[in-house]
């Protein structure tokens, strides 16, 4: 029987996908305050994000990413396209994926959930709000990872 073992915060890894370096730096600062031992990897495009996930899934040299944070509005491949691609890939579809955007449009939010996003965060937000969001996300996904794997549920 295979189970997912509990992940310690020092082993928890987040992939951040954002074409805006300033926003990525804000997320990094907020994450340092929210969960200082969590590792953050940043790529600047959705295509790079897909490639990163496929490579890490194939080679496991860094270990699997535990959570993906993806901006919705990016050039070339949008956040919508990224979510569809990841959730449509049998090897990647279980990857927890949180979309964030300046759009609070109900249609955008609904579309993200219909494509398979696990959560949606609207910005702008204060640094304090960002820290609280990241604390909650990391705590939630650490709890999920500590649940018994599918083999135990049969």
Where are these regions (language model features)?
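Non-catalytic signal-transmission and effector/linker regions of two-component phosphorelay proteins
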Residues: 1-15, 21-39, 47, 54, ...
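A Lys-centered signature of the CheY-like receiver
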Residues: 123
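Receiver (REC) domain active-site loop signature in two-component systems and cognate sites
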Residues: 74
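Short, glycine/charged-rich "phosphate-handling" switch motifs in NTP-dependent
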Residues: 118
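Conserved phosphotransfer cores of two-component systems
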Residues: 35, 57-63, 87-94, 115
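Active-site residues of response regulator receiver
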Residues: 71, 101
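Negatively charged, flexible loop motifs adjacent to catalytic sites
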Residues: 103-107
């Amino acid at each position: 029987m295979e189970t997912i073992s509990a992940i310690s915060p020092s082993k928890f890894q987040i992939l951040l996908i954002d074409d805006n370096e300033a926003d990525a730096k804000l997320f990094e600062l907020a994450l340092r305050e929210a969960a200082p031992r969590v590792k953050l990897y940043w790529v600047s495009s959705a295509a790079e994000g897909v490639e990163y996930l496929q490579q890490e899934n194939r080679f496991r040299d860094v270990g699997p990413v535990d959570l993906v944070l993806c901006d919705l509005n990016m050039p070339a491949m949008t956040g919508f396209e990224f979510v569809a691609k990841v959730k449509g890939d049998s090897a990647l579809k279980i990857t927890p994926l949180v979309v964030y955007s300046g759009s609070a449009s109900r249609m955008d939010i609904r579309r993200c959930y219909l494509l398979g996003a696990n959560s949606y965060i609207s910005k702008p937000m204060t640094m304090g709000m960002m820290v609280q969001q990241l604390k909650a996300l990391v705590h939630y996904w650490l709890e999920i990872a500590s649940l018994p794997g599918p083999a135990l549920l049969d």
